[in-house]
């Protein structure tokens, strides 16, 4: 029994070293979410799968169409992180501001419900080589207006992004986004 408890503690500690989600700050008009994760693959591979295979790892529950395979990221300045909808509709989630493959990807815009709030945000992915692969740092800084204050949205945004980045990690390492 004691060895099972020790094993459970070790698993939790190891998982904590892999995913470090944090609401870095929040206030009435905005928040910043930061996630740091180790991924066992080269930065170029992580970047490529993030950009070119977004529909394979993004959670379909966080799409307007209900199908993540309708998502795409155009790898160019002013490129679109877009989603196709039925009946020739579309959603422009974010715009590519800056990319250096295997090093950084920065998008501008508002995800999901933040679009209707007139919010503006920057979502930055930084890829740093480390001995066992890549340290991926994700920062989402958002400003906007909500009657209850934007701080109340920080934890849900953190949860959604942590889910997405965990799915990316799983996809890169195993070929499957969900474990």
Predicted features along the sequence, with ranges:
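Bacterial N-terminal signal peptides
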Residues: 7-17
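Beta-strand/loop substructures that line and gate deep hydrophobic ligand-binding cavities in soluble
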Residues: 112-162
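Short, highly charged C-terminal tails/helix-capping segments
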Residues: 170-179
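Positively charged n-region of N-terminal signal peptides that target proteins for export
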Residues: 1-5
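Hydrophobic/aromatic beta-strand elements that line small-molecule binding cavities or substrate pockets
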Residues: 35-37, 92-98, 121-129
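Short beta-edge strand/loop motif at the mouth of beta-sheet-based domains
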Residues: 54-91
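Hydrophobic ligand-binding cavity/cleft-lining segments
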Residues: 18-68
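Hydrophobic pocket/interface hotspot
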Residues: 46-50, 81, 96, 107, ...
């Amino acid at each position: 029994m004691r060895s099972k408890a020790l094993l459970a503690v070790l698993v939790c500690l190891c998982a904590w070293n892999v995913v470090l989600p944090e609401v870095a700050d929040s206030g009435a008009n905005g928040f910043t979410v930061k996630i740091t994760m180790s991924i066992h693959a080269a930065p170029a591979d992580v970047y490529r799968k993030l950009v070119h295979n977004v529909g394979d790892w993004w959670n379909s529950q966080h799409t307007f169409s209900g199908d993540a395979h309708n998502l795409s990221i155009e790898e160019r300045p002013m490129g679109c992180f877009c989603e196709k909808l039925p009946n020739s509709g579309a959603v422009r989630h974010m715009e590519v501001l800056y990319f250096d493959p295997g090093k950084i990807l920065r998008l501008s815009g508002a995800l999901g419900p933040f679009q209707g709030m007139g919010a503006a945000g920057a979502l930055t992915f930084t890829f740093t080589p480390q001995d066992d692969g890549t340290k991926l740092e994700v920062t989402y800084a958002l400003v906007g207006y909500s009657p209850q204050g934007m701080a109340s949205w920080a934890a849900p945004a953190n949860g959604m992004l942590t889910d997405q980045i965990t799915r990316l990690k799983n996809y890169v390492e195993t070929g499957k986004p969900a474990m």
